[in-house]
Amino acid sequence: MNIYFINPPFKAEYGKFSRESRSPAITKSGALYYPLWLIYAALYSSKQGHNVSFLDAPAKQLNEERSLNIIRKTDNEHSLFVLDTSTPSIKSDVAFAGKLKALYPHSFVVLV
């Protein structure tokens, strides 16, 4: 199975959004916590024999359009997308998931 793990974009124009911090927010200092739970899941899936892709959009301050372009450019036809979410960004995360589903209608999109 081809699985794409995504830390989705959120207000990239304002700075880096840290979902993993104690209080998820756009950081004033620019500090950014790694999306550890998403990385753990990606590593476990890889060890189980799945083809894994990973995108950390907030780390690169990617907006939705640039993130979707990167996803489209991968060679694999992904059957599962796993998106990291948080309460402050949930509306944006759901909208991004909807765009993924529109681009890949036969794939599953999971928000965690």
PLM features per residue range, with description:
Residues 1-112:
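A short, structured N-terminal alpha-helical element that caps or precedes a catalytic domain
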